[in-house]
Amino acid sequence: MEYAELLKRLTVDCKDDGKQFRKKDRIHEIKALLENSGYELLGEGSLSLLYGKPMEEENTYRTLVSSHVDCVYKNCFAKDEDELCWKGTFDNSATNAAVIDLMLRGELDESVLVAFTGDEEKDSAGAIEIMQMLGRMECLVGKALVLDVTNEGWEDEAAFSIENDHGFDIITGYHIVELLQASGASCVFVHEAEPDETWEYSKGSSSDLPGIPCLSPVSYTHLRAHETPEHL
């Protein structure tokens, strides 16, 4: 399935009251898309889904990719305006579609966990649920990537921005910059952007589950149709 079709399917309503999902159209689509994908639903909370490849030992997962599914739009839509542009309500279906595209194409390492969370627009209760799940699994992931859509890169005409980096060592930081430069995709760094799930993941949930080094690779809201999911 092409990214464009995934984007259309996932740009549907999903809302919560801070305790549980009240509109679950996008949740249903995610479950349907991943049903025969080789990924297993490892955990489901009132505000979260956690997927991963089946592993003999749960503590062998190394990376968490988190993409929130709650939206603030009254009416969700996705429309192909022309060959270059899409028009629609893409916060945060754009990155939901991007990570699911990578999952379906087998582009993620088997050590990667993928979380879909609610309540990101307010208190990040979905991210807190994910941290609790990781604690029960005794899973100490080494880093988290939080995907979102903002307008931080708009003035710089960047394809995406790197926001709210927490806890990454300088060697990892240089490595990320090298990879970005090699990709040719333009980006900007915003070290202290609006609060997002990185603030919860970086705090940890207990002494047994310390904070996770994390950052947010963020697409800006003017999504161009010719960009591939790797740019998001």
Q: Where do the language-model regions lie?
A:
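Active-site metal-coordination/substrate-binding segment of hydrolases
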Residues: 33, 43, 59-116
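Conserved small/polar residues in nucleotide/adenosyl-binding loops
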Residues: 221-230
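Short glycine-enriched loops at secondary-structure junctions
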Residues: 67-72, 147-151, 220
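Conserved beta-strand scaffold positions in the cores of enzyme catalytic domains, especially
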Residues: 41, 114, 144-146, 212-216
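Short secondary-structure junctions
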Residues: 36-44, 84, 185-191
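A non-catalytic alpha/beta surface segment that caps or lines the substrate-entry region
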Residues: 9-59
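Acidic/histidine-rich catalytic neighborhood of metal-dependent amide-processing enzymes
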Residues: 88-181, 185-207
